[in-house]
Amino acid sequence: LLSLARRNSAAALSACRRCGVRSLMLTAWGDNGAECSPFAVLPVIAQYSDACYGGFGEACAAPFAVWAGDLNSFFALELPNRLTEEPMWRQTNCSGKYFLYNDPLAGVFDSNVPENARAVARRNGEAIAAARGKVKKEYGYLFDTLASLCGVLELKTDFGVRAKEAYDRGDKPALAALAEECGEIVDLVKHTGLTY
């Protein structure tokens, strides 16, 4: 998550400065190399850049605004991985990823579905869409993709739970509605651009 990377980087930069380290290498890791745009970590790169010029990473918002847009808006990019209303320090997983790839009929992650996941995913998608207007247009695709992902997560995260409950009740109309929702989920996944 971006906020954790910035917090950890602040500690690393402080330690480097305190210990006299003058050269370091910053890396960005993406699962399978293509699951995350390298531009999603621009705020962390800006933090290191500010440190190179003698700052502590806090003064990078103004120069960042010139070439990328509002620095704080980039933190909306971590919202698909925040599907609960828990404080950020309690959320260090990539729930957006495992709910996207989860087979909702297998029930593997059903016990991990947050109670308000649908409402939180909807709000997150709206927040990401709003943040998009505060960044340079060349980075808009980051926000469009993740807002679309939130649309998928809104329907898919608790799909297995809802299907199991409807099945256990013998609620055929609810199951028929869920079958139709499957098509909507597939269409949303295609719209995200996250499939090959």
Q: What are these model-predicted stretches?
A:
Residues 1-196:
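Substrate-binding groove of N-acetylhexosamine-processing glycoside hydrolases
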